[in-house]
């Protein structure tokens, strides 16, 4: 089993992945002042619930991505504790199967690289990934596997929280999918503007990207808030809540020391004689179409 760690602005996601299948997912709060020992204590709580005397949790290796540099080292130390090996840390220098077509690859969020790499390996090209989290991010990979860049917007919950904090007469609202575009009270108006507004954003930005690419693109959506938004989208899409964790496992396959794995999407990196090693199943080419 591979230990995948995704350090986000709000939460740290831990995933156990075996043979391309996500076996478990757990979350911890992202606390920038925690030490490695404190994070290890939190991880111990997570793993203690999954231990069995006859089937202990064992990790053959770890892979880590982070958008919070202050705690990357602490979580990397934790990963090494549980695996006995240095983790694969996502950066522009590792094998991804992509060509970075942006001026400064180091400025691209590492989670964006992970999403794009997995989507490019498993879906028809060109492909657009959208991650609905603290920020809403779009990533674009063209038909030649070139990472072209993307779009960054305030996240759905970030916008709702800002309204509640900055507007004295607007309440905090619990997320749900609005039934109508026209709200009849303050809460339903806010939900329509935020949730339906995000769905329209996805449709509109995707259409503009397709115009610039000069051809239709596959749309893949992930993130904890996507379940509220995707039913309202009109562009055909695939929703995969585990996209990033699967992407981390793919990058582990490509970069783990002394291991030679074939690329999950069938793309063989130049200069490497990879043998096939239990690749991820290729996602169905059909995408789900949901209309608002």
Where are these regions (language model features)?
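Short, hydrophobic alpha-helical segments
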Residues: 47, 123, 252-256
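Short glycine-rich, Thr/Ser-proximal phosphate-binding strand/loop in the N-terminal lobe
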Residues: 2-45, 55, 146-171, 176-180
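Short glycine-aspartate micro-motif
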Residues: 2-6, 63, 127-131, 220
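Phosphate-binding/catalytic loop of phosphoryl-transfer enzymes
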Residues: 85-166, 195-208, 265, 275, ...
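A short acidic, often aromatic-flanked loop/helix-cap motif at beta-alpha or helix-coil junctions
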Residues: 33-35, 94-98, 243-247
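Phosphate/pyrophosphate-binding loops at sites that engage ATP/ADP/AMP, CoA/4′-phosphopantetheine
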Residues: 43-61, 205-217
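Short beta-strand-loop/turn "lid" adjacent to the catalytic site in phosphate-handling enzymes
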Residues: 51-107, 144-150, 155-156, 184-195, ...
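ATP-binding/phosphotransfer module of carbohydrate and carboxylate kinases, centering on a glycine-rich
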Residues: 2-4, 160-292
């Amino acid at each position: 089993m591979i230990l995948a760690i995704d350090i986000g602005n709000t939460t740290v996601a831990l995933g156990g992945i075996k043979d391309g299948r996500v076996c478990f997912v757990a979350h911890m709060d992202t606390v920038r002042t925690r030490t490695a020992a404190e994070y290890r204590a939190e991880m111990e709580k997570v793993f203690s619930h999954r231990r069995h005397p006859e089937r202990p949790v064992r990790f053959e290796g770890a892979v880590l991505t982070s958008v919070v540099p202050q705690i990357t080292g602490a979580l990397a130390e934790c990963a090494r504790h549980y695996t006995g090996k240095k983790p694969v840390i996502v950066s522009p220098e590792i094998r991804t199967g992509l060509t970075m077509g942006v001026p400064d690859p180091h400025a691209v969020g590492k989670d964006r690289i992970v999403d794009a790499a997995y989507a490019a390996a498993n879906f028809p090209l060109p492909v657009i990934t959208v991650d609905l989290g603290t920020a809403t991010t779009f990533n674009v990979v063209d038909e030649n596997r070139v990472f072209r860049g993307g779009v960054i917007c305030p996240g759905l919950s970030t916008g709702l929280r800002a309204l509640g904090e900055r507007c004295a007469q607007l309440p905090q609202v619990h997320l749900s999918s609005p039934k109508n575009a026209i709200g009849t009270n303050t809460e339903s108006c806010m939900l329509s503007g935020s949730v339906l507004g995000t769905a329209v954003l996805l449709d509109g930005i995707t259409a503009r990207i397709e115009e610039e690419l000069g051809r239709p693109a596959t749309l893949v959506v992930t993130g904890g808030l996507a379940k509220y938004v995707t039913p309202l989208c009109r562009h055909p899409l695939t929703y995969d809540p585990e996209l990033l964790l699967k992407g981390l496992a793919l990058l582990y396959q490509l970069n783990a020391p002394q291991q030679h794995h074939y690329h999950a999407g069938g793309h063989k990196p130049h200069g490497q004689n990879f043998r096939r090693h239990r690749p991820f199943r290729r996602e169905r080419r059909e995408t789900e179409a949901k209309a608002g």
